[in-house]
Amino acid sequence: MSKVASIVDVLQGKVAIGETVTVRGWVRTRRDSKAGLSFLAVYDGSCFDPIQAIINNDIENYESEILRLTTGCSVIVTGKVVESPAEGQAVELQAEKVEVTGFVEDPDTYPMAAKRHSIEYLREVAHLRPRTNIIGAVARVRHCLSQAIHRFFHEQGFYWVATPLITASDTEGAGEMFRVSTLDLENLPRSENGKVDFSQDFFGKESFLTVSGQLNGETYACALSKIYTFGPTFRAENSNTTRHLAEFWMVEPEVAFATLADNAKLAEDMLKYVFRAVLAERKDDLQFFEKHVDKDVITRLENFVNSDFAQIDYTDAIDVLLKSGKKFEFPVSWGIDLSSEHERFLAEEYFKSPVVVKNYPKDIKAFYMRLNDDEKTVAAMDVLAPGIGEIIGGSQREERLEVLDKRMEEMGLNPDDYWWYRDLRKYGSVPHSGFGLGFERLIVYVTGVQNIRDVIPFPRAPRNANF
């Protein structure tokens, strides 16, 4: 019995020329020659390229099955690895046996037929779109990036912490949260003042899907020193744009005793590490994106890993924007939250490199960010990347209880709701810092795929929760 191998192993020469091997996958294309040969391009998802299998018409099921094969049919091909005379790949399979495990019922109506489909159409058939070149490549890049992130933090001595998806806290203080409830919507319990009585709900209080694992992560950082979370987060933000998802993944490290400068260095080291990994490990997929999606994909990543990060205070960044002579869609003044056009001008035109903007006005940032001595700004930072703008947001956290309480009061938050978070400041408080990286935004940056809904397997967005 021949050994089973992945197509990537065969194409990379891990199976010797002349050896008999079995590959299992799906037909991308079939073409027939007048000489009584059929050529199957078979893929199994292990790499971008399919392998070519050459089938003689003397194979017993040639007439009955091989000539009926169409795009999407599943096959098990056993054959000898031979050198390929054709350009494009070094080896091919001289088939000795082809077992058809599944035909496509009606090739004419198969949604993934060989013709090229628009990315918008593929969203409507998200259960089948992994079979396409583009979504298969995105999936492999996504895997590579996630593994590189875990590897980076492991090598740096971090511990991964599983923070809860159901929470009673609003980390961002923005209120755009999905409520979790088992109450009967047709018969809601009411308190004396007429409001919904959540004490009768499953958790005995109002509960939500998390918008961030940060606050929970801080509790572990204040015991294990260096932790990170990596998991799904949820925002009930009614934004139907190419940049927003209702469910997305976040990477959130948190480090005890770390300053804002330490935080910026960690962000730079992590991004460069994962970009080097994807350049080394997913070259075939990146070349596809370079050819068909964004010609600057590889150059952009190479420039990024070879760039020193610029740093600028928010106040100085506002001056740069005001003096640029450029007419922005959103007017520039001290106190605004930088828009994407401002961020991209700084990274792409002014610095021409990744840039860390730090020390933002306190009124546009979250309650947990450390108040600076000027009492107008907080020790917050954003990493801006050429080609996309903000890719990471973080801060040094407020470790002084009285300052934290005052900030919560200013923002209309009830300290009692955050009693456990305040406890961290009562019992051995330490300066600490962390940041958040939207994982899908990272994939958009790496692949050049413009719509964030195309880099997550099953996108969740306003009025869209199919599959």
Curated annotation (Swiss-Prot):
Where found in the cell?
Answer: Cytoplasm
Q: Which UniProt keywords apply?
A: Aminoacyl-tRNA synthetase, ATP-binding, Cytoplasm, Ligase, Nucleotide-binding, Protein biosynthesis
Q: What class of enzyme is it?
A: ligase
* TM annotation in the entry: none
Q: Which SUPFAM superfamilies match?
A: Class II aaRS and biotin synthetases, Nucleic acid-binding proteins
Q: Which GO terms describe its cellular component?
A: cytoplasm
Q: Which reaction does it catalyse?
A: tRNA(Asn) + L-asparagine + ATP = L-asparaginyl-tRNA(Asn) + AMP + diphosphate + H(+)
Pfam families xref list: tRNA-synt_2 (PF00152), tRNA_anti-codon (PF01336)
Q: What is an annotated GO biological process for this record, any one?
A: asparaginyl-tRNA aminoacylation
EC no. given is: 6.1.1.22
**Disulfide partners:** none
Write one Gene Ontology MF term: asparagine-tRNA ligase activity
Which family does the record assign? Belongs to the class-II aminoacyl-tRNA synthetase family.
Q: Which NCBIfam families does the annotation name?
A: asnS (TIGR00457), PRK03932.1 (NF003037)
* The protein's assembly and partners: Homodimer.
- Tell me which HAMAP family the record gives: Asn_tRNA_synth
| Protein name according to UniProt | Asparagine--tRNA ligase
Upper lineage: Bacteria, Pseudomonadati, Pseudomonadota, Gammaproteobacteria, Pasteurellales
- What gene does this protein come from? asnS
